């Protein structure tokens, strides 16, 4: 049997306590449940609040929210632009239900993320109040709830991420089989969102810092790397058979980022390339517009007869990278700080934030989605960039016409815009604490408990750096910042707990002095 210790960690129950064979018969389950609820009441309250938000989202928007990228998974739009691992979850759910069922399951996954983070941090030795603090953002952040209501793969990427990191941290000593399973799970995130390819780097760093013994590190590292590669290679192999391309997807271009940083007035360019270089007014529309809009000078500027536009764009970006690299780096650095801003205001520079906010109406994205007679959802499928759209009504099996419960939608929107998201300064504090814990881990300072907390903080902090900084190399989007809710809070809590542990006297626990030897049972 297990019970909850004073520090909030689930462990063996002491003899004679409720829940053991020597406790009061017939009441062990009730005592255990009451004790657990009393001990973990805060995470319980957060889970209930998170559940209420998700039920409201389900009621507010029927059958679910559909975004431009949703059509890639439902109709095969824009083939090759993103990996399609999401279909492994989506197709079975659509066999038994419609898009509402998919959204409901995604909301359950969001709740599970909060519970999982709480348990992982308790297992690692944090205070239960701090563990609940780390779980609160993913449970209560309206941007997280909105993406769960949308038919998009993001929540499943987070599930695989937290599951893989949790396995790496589950036991004090990482075994080869557990490392292999963790690698397999983390590698499976890449076919869901391509940025998952980068997760091997923080995981490998964790192994190097957390484990002792060269032989053990090598064996465990090989198991992790090989297992990580298996789902990626498998997906790429299937892609090669079907499309002739051994890839997850064609990958995102840096063209928009590079040309948005250019000072075209001082840049030396060939005469046939110069018309493609954007003016300051055009640059204010940001990297996304410059790279994807047909009105961008990259695609609208006249070119000489016989010239290839793609070659001219390549010459332009090469010149900018060679002569103005600091301007590119400055643009990336500036966007990387947006996550920590006090407010989330619309900006023409970045992808419109309203895409990730609850609306009082059913959101549409002409020509990709729009509403027809009777609020029927009409989708426009485009198979190539700037190609023609093929329109049809949403398949009946996916759900009926768009329906919005306006009072609930208004409440959700007000909640989101009036503070129902994780504040940027709080995320900054989490990041600073996580970095401090990472320094402790790298310096190998403190007691075994301190180091366990510090290396856990290192793993989550490294993961956050990879997942949050890498997208900024291409363009900033609030959607790409969503993994912050499942990486920065646990990183900060683990780092802060490591600092507390470092300053605590030996023999103390997170909740006070260590208990003395238990009296023998009478």
Please report, for each region that a protein language model flagged, where it lies by residue.
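Membrane-interface alpha helices of multi-pass inner-membrane proteins
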Residues: 135, 179-193, 227-235
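Transmembrane-helix signature of polytopic, membrane-embedded enzymes
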Residues: 117-140, 158-159, 172-181
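Transmembrane signal-anchor helices characteristic of membrane glycosylation enzymes that use polyprenol
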Residues: 38-65, 139-140, 227-239
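Membrane-interface anchor segments at the N-terminal boundary of transmembrane helices
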Residues: 38-41, 97-104, 330-460
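Multi-pass, polyprenyl lipid-linked donor-dependent membrane glycosyltransferases
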Residues: 68, 102-111, 136-163, 168, ...
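Membrane-proximal stem/loop segments at transmembrane-domain junctions that anchor or position
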Residues: 248-397
């Amino acid at each position: 049997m297990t019970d909850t210790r004073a520090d909030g960690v689930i462990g063996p129950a002491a003899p004679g306590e409720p829940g053991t064979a020597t406790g009061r018969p017939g009441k062990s389950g009730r005592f255990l449940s009451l004790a657990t609820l009393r001990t973990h009441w805060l995470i319980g309250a957060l889970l209930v609040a998170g559940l209420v938000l998700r039920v409201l989202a389900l009621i507010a928007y029927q059958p679910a929210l559909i975004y431009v990228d949703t059509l890639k998974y439902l109709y095969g739009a824009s083939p090759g632009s993103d990996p399609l691992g999401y279909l492994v979850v989506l197709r079975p759910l659509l066999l038994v239900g419609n898009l509402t069922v998919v959204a409901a399951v995604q909301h359950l996954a969001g709740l599970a993320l909060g519970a999982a983070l709480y348990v992982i941090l308790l297992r690692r030795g944090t205070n239960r109040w701090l563990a609940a603090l780390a779980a609160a953002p993913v449970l209560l952040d309206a941007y997280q709830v909105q993406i769960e209501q949308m038919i998009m793969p993001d929540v499943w990427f987070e599930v695989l991420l937290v599951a893989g990191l949790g396995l790496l941290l589950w036991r004090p000593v990482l075994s080869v089989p557990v490392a292999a399973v963790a690698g397999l799970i983390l590698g499976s995130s890449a076919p869901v969102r391509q940025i998952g390819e980068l997760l091997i780097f923080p995981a490998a760093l964790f192994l190097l810092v957390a484990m002792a013994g060269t032989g053990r590190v090598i064996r465990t590292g090989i198991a992790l790397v090989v297992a990580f590669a298996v789902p990626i290679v498998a997906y790429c192999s299937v892609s090669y058979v079907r499309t002739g391309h051994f890839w997850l997807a064609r990958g995102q271009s840096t063209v928009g980022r590079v040309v948005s940083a250019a000072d075209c007035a001082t840049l030396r360019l060939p005469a046939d390339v110069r018309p493609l270089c954007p003016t300051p007014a055009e640059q204010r529309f940001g990297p996304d517009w410059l790279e994807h809009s047909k009105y961008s000078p990259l695609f609208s500027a006249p070119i000489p007869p016989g010239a290839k536009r793609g070659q001219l764009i390549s010459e332009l970006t090469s010149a900018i990278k060679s002569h103005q690299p600091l301007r590119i780096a400055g643009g990336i650095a500036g966007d990387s700080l947006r996550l920590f801003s006090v407010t989330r205001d619309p900006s023409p520079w970045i992808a419109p934030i309203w895409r990730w906010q609850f609306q009082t109406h059913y959101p549409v994205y002409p020509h990709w989605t729009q509403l027809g007679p009777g609020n029927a959802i009409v989708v426009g499928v485009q198979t190539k960039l700037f190609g023609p759209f093929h329109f049809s009504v949403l398949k009946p099996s996916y759900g009926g016409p768009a329906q919005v419960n306006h009072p609930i939608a208004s409440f959700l929107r007000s909640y989101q815009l009036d503070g129902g998201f994780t504040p940027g300064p709080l995320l900054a504090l989490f990041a600073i604490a996580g970095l401090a814990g990472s320094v402790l881990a790298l310096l190998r300072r403190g007691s075994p408990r301190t180091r366990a907390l510090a290396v856990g903080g290192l793993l989550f902090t490294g993961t956050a750096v990879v997942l949050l900084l890498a997208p900024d190399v291409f363009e900033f989007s609030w959607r790409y910042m969503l993994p912050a809710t499942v990486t920065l809070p646990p990183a900060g809590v683990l780092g802060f707990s490591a600092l507390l542990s470092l300053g605590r006297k030996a023999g103390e626990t997170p909740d006070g002095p260590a208990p003395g030897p238990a009296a023998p049972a009478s």
